[in-house]
Design a protein with these regions (language model features):
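Charged, low-complexity surface patches
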Residues: 9, 33, 107
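Ribokinase/PfkB-type carbohydrate-kinase core domain
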Residues: 42-56, 60, 68-169
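Catalytic-core segment of enzymes that process non-peptidic bonds
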Residues: 32-33, 63-68
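Glycine-rich, flexible loop/turn motifs
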Residues: 3-5, 29, 50, 65, ...
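Conserved alpha-helical elements of sugar-nucleotide-dependent glycosyltransferases
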Residues: 12, 36, 110
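Glycine-rich phosphate/adenosyl-contacting loop at the front of the ribokinase-like
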Residues: 1-30, 39, 86
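Short, electropositive alpha-helical surface patch
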Residues: 29-48
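Short, basic and Ser/Thr-rich N-terminal targeting/leader segments
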Residues: 23, 60-62
Length: 169
């Protein structure tokens, strides 16, 4: 029996864009959502975020995490990537007036593609691998580092990056 349940709106693109918006920025959200997207995209618009480059994948659900926390604060997380796995359908060239990009946790192929597209377009970007870091091998991570102008990660992720690449930060 699960006595309490609540929906939280999250996702890397939405969270980053909302935070930048609160700081006075004009972020452009590029993401993929599923057939169940309406409450999420409505909320983004209500918060002042543009959704012009949020692509709906009609045969998928929006990525979702279900987190169960016991009375001792231990957590089990089940994650379904859903539409996020189609992030490679979005292309940087479809967006205008981009001066800085962020490659944050997303579908594996999409992250690789978007880093390459930012670089080819001459748009500097932040590589923020977050929980997506384990998806990549040494060569892929070295490529991200080479292409990116900036990197953002916590101490745990930085240590994992050093271990996977054999490089120090």
């Amino acid at each position: 029996l699960v006595p309490h349940m609540r929906r939280e709106y999250g996702g890397c693109a939405g969270n980053i864009a909302y935070s930048l918006h609160l700081l006075g920025g004009k972020p452009l959200v590029m993401a993929t959502v599923g057939q169940d997207h309406a409450p999420y995209t409505d909320r983004m618009r209500q918060k002042g975020l543009l959704t012009d480059h949020v692509t709906v994948i009609p045969d998928a659900f929006t990525a979702q995490a279900f987190i169960t926390t016991d009375l001792d604060d231990n957590q089990i997380t089940a994650f379904h990537p859903g539409a996020m796995s189609s992030s490679h359908r979005n292309h940087i060239a479809d967006a205008e007036d981009v001066s800085l990009g962020i490659v944050a946790p997303d579908g594996r192929d999409g992250m690789i593609q978007h880093a390459r597209e930012f670089h080819e377009a001459g748009i500097p970007f932040v590589f923020d691998p977050g929980q997506g870091l384990p998806m990549f091998d040494r060569e892929e991570l070295l490529s991200f580092i080479k292409l990116a102008e900036y990197a953002a990660m916590n101490e745990y992720e930085a240590k994992m990056l050093e271990e996977k690449t054999g490089q120090t930060l």
